[in-house]
Regions:
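Central regulatory/effector-binding core of bacterial HTH transcription factors
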Residues: 98-161
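A late-sequence structural motif
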Residues: 187-188, 236, 254-293
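A short LG(V/I)-centered, amphipathic sequence patch enriched
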Residues: 21, 43-65
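Alpha-helical linker/hinge and terminal dimerization helices associated
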Residues: 45-46, 67-94
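Short helix-boundary/capping micro-motifs
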Residues: 13-31
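Secondary-structure junction motif
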Residues: 157, 192-217, 277-285
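Acidic, Gly/Pro-rich loop/turn segments at junctions of secondary structure
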Residues: 135-192, 245, 250
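A ligand-binding cleft/hinge motif common to bilobed small-molecule-binding domains
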Residues: 155-165, 226-255, 261
Length: 293
């Protein structure tokens, strides 16, 4: 099998991200026939159909999704190679770390775990330019962004039965307990309706919920944890929330411990083996670990 060239990888990514050969051609400054020819060549080299063609465009097959994820990650290594080599050339005895560092994180982690780490990272390595995207921790979540090649490092919830996508490296940064949060001064918070949001916790914590006969089914669903906190503060219900989310709690709510057998969740970083060896990702992991606790 012949190796795919960088331009062939770029074309695969462009077709997947634009949803069609014509749109990919326009984005890359190529003709549609050149894009079609390149994709057919890539399919012949890889021995698999990568895109389903239709009148409305092109969508990756399962094989295509895997190919595009690898393509993104390989192209990213080309970028990092250039940045690290240039930094080594200017380092005068030590490596100068520079370039874009792509980070994916769920909302409360982006608000509370990342800022102190990024502040120290900027002080030590001013040439690094972090790009942070907040993603919902549902389904593949932040770990999926890393696996798909859209992020160099993700801040994700760990420890679920599904685990991180195969082939990724991870490390625990914090273990946070869940608490009962309810309107301040309420005489019987457990009698209130339960408020929840989709990305609150995984199935491993939900099993604890199901074993508690005092927890009703959620009657109110909100978009995110900030909305849940606001609604609880307005007296509309109670909620069970992790500590990171509760850092935004105001005097409008009270927080009650759920005891030593209450649920906990692990929050950590996720990256690929190739990104784990890059200078910028290694530097960020060091800062995240020093933020730990």
């Amino acid at each position: 099998m012949s190796d795919l060239l960088p331009q062939e990888l770029r074309i695969l990514v462009a077709v997947a991200e634009t949803g069609g050969f014509s749109a990919a051609a326009a984005a890359l400054g190529l003709t549609q026939s050149a894009v079609s020819h390149s994709v057919r060549g890539s399919e012949a080299k890889l021995g698999a159909v990568l895109f389903e063609r239709g009148r409305t465009g092109a969508s990756p097959t399962r094989a295509g999704e895997r190919a595009v994820a690898h393509a993104r990650r390989i192209l990213r290594l080309y970028e990092v190679m250039g940045a690290e080599v240039r930094g080594a050339g200017r380092g005068e005895g030590r490596d100068t770390v520079e370039g874009v560092l792509r980070i994916a994180a769920f909302r409360s982690a982006a608000l509370h775990l990342l800022p102190p780490a990024l502040e120290r990272l900027a002080a030590r390595h001013p040439g690094i330019r972090p790009e942070v995207r907040v993603v919902r921790e549902i389904g593949a979540g932040a770990a999926g962004e890393v696996a798909e090649g859209r992020a160099d490092l993700g801040i994700a919830t760990l420890g679920s039965p599904e685990g991180a996508p195969p082939g990724l490296l991870s490390g625990v940064l914090a273990e946070e307990a869940y608490r009962l949060v309810h309107p301040a001064g309420h005489p019987d918070p457990k009698a209130l309706p339960l408020m929840d949001w989709d990305e609150n916790c995984g199935s491993y914590t939900r099993s604890w919920w199901r074993s508690q006969d005092w927890i009703p089914r959620a009657t109110v669903k909100a978009e995110d944890d900030a909305m849940v906190l606001t609604m609880v503060g307005r007296g509309l219900g109670m909620a069970i929330m992790p500590e990171l989310s509760l850092r935004e709690a105001t005097e409008a709510v009270d927080i009650t411990d759920l005891g030593p057998r209450g649920p906990v969740r692990q929050v950590g970083y996720v990256t690929t083996p190739e990104s784990a060896s890059t200078l910028a990702v290694r530097a960020l992991i060091r800062e995240l670990r020093s933020t730990k606790g």
